């Protein structure tokens, strides 16, 4: 079963699966900042949600770089949220959680991606 439009793009009516990429999964990454009132000036904030957004954007850049270098991979953020028990319109979030699944065809490439993740 083809899960992406790659067959249509290639003009191929059928294909044979020749492998399954390996993966590294991080089911729960927590970014810890500091809860604060909405009135706190930006320079004093430790906004965990913005840090999560920065991480997501950095992962997208990493993915684009890998593909541009001819190294296919996949990066999926399945969960991306502040903590429900702390949700409030006027609170700078002090905690943020996400899940991450990184995939690549070669074990060495996957290890390199994990190192790059830790460098973000």
PLM ranges: what are they?
Residues 112-120:
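Short amphipathic alpha-helices in soluble, non-transmembrane regions
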Residues 1-108:
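Midchain, well-structured core segments that form catalytic/ion-binding scaffolds
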């Amino acid at each position: 079963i083809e899960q992406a439009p790659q067959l249509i793009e290639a003009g191929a009516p059928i294909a044979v699966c020749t492998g399954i990429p390996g993966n590294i999964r991080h089911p729960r990454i927590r970014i810890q900042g500091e809860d604060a009132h909405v009135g706190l000036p930006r320079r004093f904030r430790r906004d965990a949600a913005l840090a999560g957004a920065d991480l997501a954007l950095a992962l997208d850049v990493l993915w684009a770089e890998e593909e541009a270098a001819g190294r296919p991979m996949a990066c999926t953020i399945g969960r991306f949220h502040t903590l429900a028990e702390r949700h409030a319109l006027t609170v700078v979030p002090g905690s943020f959680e996400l899940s991450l699944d990184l995939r690549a065809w070669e074990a060495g490439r996957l290890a390199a991606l994990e190192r790059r993740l830790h460098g973000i």
